[in-house]
């Protein structure tokens, strides 16, 4: 494993102050306040509070299907890249996850009903079963305590000839990611890069093997993240149009969020590439307010494997039924002709 650190436009001594400033800027509308606000905002998001939520379930179920297909399709080496990697591995039994309780509306009910030894294990749709199997490999005791993020899912399914590149700009998370990855048996195939994944991705494409899977999933704390996703993907497709690209996004009452899938669809159609769009909403209980956290999210995949739509069509009804909280729950799935 190699860990590469890129210089940040702020001094290390200022990090603690940036955490405080980041919270203030977010409340004030940081997206209008320039580069310093952007840096502070990036430092304020910690995925450890959200690990294993319904958004992770959607994203990681699709990721497992795609990775398994690509690994089996050809022996040619595959480049895997995650633009916003986080720490790679999370503990659901520790304070961050316990405080938010988001896994209780995500992976935990699925694990209890369809995980190892559960009554419904044999009836789990193939995509859901494969996803839970990856989690089980990290939780030999049968209790779901450790949750592998996208980097660890990719590491679990990659082959000896594949390479994994992980971008993480957050100073604390990048150090934790480096430490977590170092303990993997295939760590020599993985490179941790402390850099902005939107820009860092450019140096990787096109890969020498002409095969790549790229996951783009920023926190979207800033409105500018949506435009950066589109710009990043447009640049990536100009460099390597045949790669498989997964974009995750939150479904929230913000114009940029509503426009994003339409912009991605237009981008794929202009390039003549196939696409798939899936959303999952757990709805909202009668006693829950509009401030009770994220209720829905979506993924947009360019150049998806042909099996992905069918696998999600089987899995999403089961996932939605298990996780639904009330009014507004549902799922949608559409793909290119």
Report the location of each language-model feature.
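Class I S-adenosyl-L-methionine-dependent methyltransferase catalytic core
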Residues: 35, 39-337
């Amino acid at each position: 494993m190699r860990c590469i650190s890129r210089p940040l436009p702020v001094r290390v001594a200022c990090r603690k102050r940036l955490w405080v400033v980041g919270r203030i800027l977010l409340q004030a509308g940081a997206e209008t306040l320039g580069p310093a606000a952007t840096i502070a905002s990036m430092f304020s998001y910690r995925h450890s509070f959200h690990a294993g939520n319904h958004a992770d379930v959607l994203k990681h179920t699709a990721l497992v299907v795609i990775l398994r297909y690509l690994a089996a399709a050809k022996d040619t080496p595959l480049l895997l890249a995650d633009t916003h990697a986080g720490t790679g591995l999370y503990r659901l039994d520790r304070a961050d996850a316990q405080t938010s309780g988001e896994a209780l509306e995500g992976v935990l009910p699925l694990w209890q009903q369809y995980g190892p030894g559960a009554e419904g294990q044999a009836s789990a749709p193939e995509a859901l079963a494969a996803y839970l199997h990856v989690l089980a490999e990290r939780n030999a005791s049968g209790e779901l305590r450790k949750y592998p993020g996208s980097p660890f899912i990719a590491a679990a399914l990659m082959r000896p000839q594949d390479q994994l590149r992980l971008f993480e700009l957050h100073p604390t998370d990048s150090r934790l990611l480096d430490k977590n990855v170092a303990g993997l048996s295939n760590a020599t195939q993985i490179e941790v890069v402390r850099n902005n994944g939107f820009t860092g991705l450019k140096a990787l494409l096109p890969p020498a093997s002409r095969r790549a899977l790229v996951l783009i999933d920023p926190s979207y704390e800033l409105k500018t993240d949506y435009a950066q996703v589109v710009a990043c993907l447009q640049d990536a497709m100009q460099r390597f149009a045949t790669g498989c690209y997964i974009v995750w996004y939150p479904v929230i009452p913000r114009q940029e969020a509503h426009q994003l899938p339409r912009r991605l669809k237009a981008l794929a159609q202009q390039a003549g590439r196939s696409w798939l769009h899936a959303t999952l909403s757990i709805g909202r209980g009668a006693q829950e307010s509009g401030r009770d956290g994220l209720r829905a999210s979506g993924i947009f995949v360019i150049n998806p494997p042909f099996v992905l739509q069918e696998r999600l069509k089987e899995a999403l009804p089961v996932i939605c039924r298990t996780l639904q909280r009330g009014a507004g729950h549902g799922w949608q799935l559409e793909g290119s002709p």
